[in-house]
């Protein structure tokens, strides 16, 4: 049997990952997939959230091998990457994110390549881009 196609999954680190796990569900509409906590419940060792057929992974910042390689936005004074979520209902998604406390960095707008996008920042500084453009399909 052939192996499944490779998947690209974004992995993010948070100072308060247990809180952000719930916040991402509230603000962006992710669904819980998996969460593994430390015995005291203060550290999210590994979390997975699903949206459609896509996933993100997140966890608490720790001083381990991976943690030494990956920084949080607050440690960098910004971020070097941002997840892009291809979806419909951009205006409604923007309002949902705003109500949950996201900082809206770019209000919904139509782009010259046929997408409608907005950009926001979560409470710990990760930048999220939402748009109707789907890279697997030609732009209109």
Go through each PLM region and give its residues.
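Short acidic-aromatic low-complexity motifs
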Residues: 14-18
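Vicinal oxygen chelate
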Residues: 1-11, 21-121, 131-140
